[in-house]
Amino acid sequence: MKVCKKKLFSILFIFFSINVFAKSSDLQIHYINVGQGGSTLIIGPNGTKILYDFGRVSGRKYIVPYLKERLKLQPEKGIDYAILSHADKDHYMGYRDIVSQEFGGFNILKANYEPGTSKQSKTLKKYLFDPAKDENIKAGAFRPIPLGLLIDLGNGAKAIVVAANGNVLGDDPFEKNNRSINENDRSISLFIKYDKFQYILDGDLGAGREKCSNHQTSQRDIQTKVAQSLLDFGLIDKDNGVDILHIAHHGSESSTSWSYYQLVKPEVGIISVGPDQGNFLHPRVDVVENVLTCKTTDGKFHKDACSKERGGDTRATCYSVGERAPPLKALYQTDYGSPGESSTGRTSFQGFVGGDIIISTDGNTNYSIEWTGNTIHSPKTVHYESIPSGKTNFKFDETR
């Protein structure tokens, strides 16, 4: 652990020395609405592009148009890194359309990364591994991402790989190719920092069972180890936590436990979710109302939902009110979940549905969250009124 810390601090020292005089610009994080699944584009101040996950068979329908038409990206200039969080269909099947000359034509320039999955299937080969081997793809075949990898995003901004394939930076490793690891728990966890701004993106990573928040799951608790690693390395502050948290696994009860939330203390949460999800009931009330915020009489998110005027803080009653991390200031989701209820929970509709969600920050004064209102219509879900595009600004508050 001590050796690992020294190595990381040496890397960070060199990194800051090199980039201290870089030109200032915004960091952007785009949650592309692919429905039930995930695809997130990170654009650094220096223009470095990381595409994290590629959605289902939606590359040509959702991702490619977003990249070309909304962002005006030129395929021949490419995307620097393609990172697959884990090998589930709703995270990888769009890759083929993104890189194929027929649809996207985007070149991957520096690396195609995956967590080190042991999963093998014809579908995985067809939609991910084989397309990456095309002679037009400069980065070449997918390969396991190195734990602790640091990607320079420019002007002091960086992305660090804190977890991959069930292993966490600074923690004892799992056995290589351990097939007992749930594929979700192989998810790559990226920590992104730009001056005052901090953000965690971690696919479908699990937080394990927890009585306090009524989480029932077969997934392991990897998220709490990630949070502890960030604290141990001094990458986040124990009192202030992170600004924005990716609510992993589409808001499933497998992830985002109270123990994890208590350590990362986010201000804003974002859920990538959508219709046509079967009986998963994402996002779940036991995550939204037991961890992120409190239950409300109208079923909608209210910033003061946990105030005394609204009935007090009803989350995680195994902790005293004074010990609990503050509830979220805002909760966004890319689309509506499918309504339903089972013996283990039901769907939450508290999150503000925004379609594509764009985070922008200069790293110093504030960060903003913008939404397009672009939702996906399906007969299998509930749709409310049309959503206009909009934007909200958040000031950095290191004493919250």
Regions found by a protein language model. Give the residues of each.
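Active-site metal-binding motif and surrounding structural segment of the metallo-beta-lactamase
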Residues: 45-50, 57-110, 231-252, 265-270
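Active-site metal-binding loops of divalent metal-dependent hydrolases
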Residues: 34, 53-57, 87, 164-166, ...
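Internal alpha/beta domain cores that form substrate/cofactor-binding pockets in large enzymes
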Residues: 242-319, 324, 329, 354
